[in-house]
Amino acid sequence: MNLRIPGPIPVPDDILEEMSGPMINHRGPEYKDLLFRTTDRLKQIFETTGDVWVITSSGSGAMEAAIVNTLSPGDKVVNATIGVFGNRFTDIAEIYGAEVITLSFPFGEVIDLDTLRDTLNDDPDIKAVMVTHNETSTGVTND
């Protein structure tokens, strides 16, 4: 079976075989070494010298982590949304007390940068901009 969705995905046999081995201690030196090797490789892929974080959650969990670690209740933010997961950014930010200006663009299209730019220029109190890079619900990527 070959599914054309974000997940689950077909897993190659060699990966399944590797996964059948014993678990490693996620607080031990073997895991620490694995994590550092992985983040070093991710830095190369993303062409950065900055920190790279591996988050063991769904995409929604990563969105929530981004919000709770950067915003405070009452902060004004803009969310430019083009789909279901973009809308989720608004929901999560509002749950944590942010004042969200939601710019909704047609599903299946990228955000309009002129509209976003105008919104930012019109309100100096905006602390953050939220954009879903790859909107899974429509398959559109905001560049």
What do the PLM-derived regions correspond to, one by one?
Residues 111-143:
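Active-site phosphate-binding strand-loop segment of PLP-dependent enzymes
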Residues 88-101, 106, 114-119:
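Active-site-proximal loop->helix
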Residues 1-56:
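A glycine-/small-polar-enriched, mobile loop at the entrance of the PLP active site in fold-type I
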Residues 49-78, 82, 86-90:
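Conserved beta-loop-alpha segment that forms the PLP phosphate-binding cup at the N-terminus of a helix
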Residues 61-62, 83-87, 99, 107-110, ...:
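A short acidic, glycine/proline-enriched capping/turn motif at secondary-structure boundaries
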Residues 48-50, 73-76, 96-99, 123-127:
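Short coil/turn connectors at secondary-structure junctions
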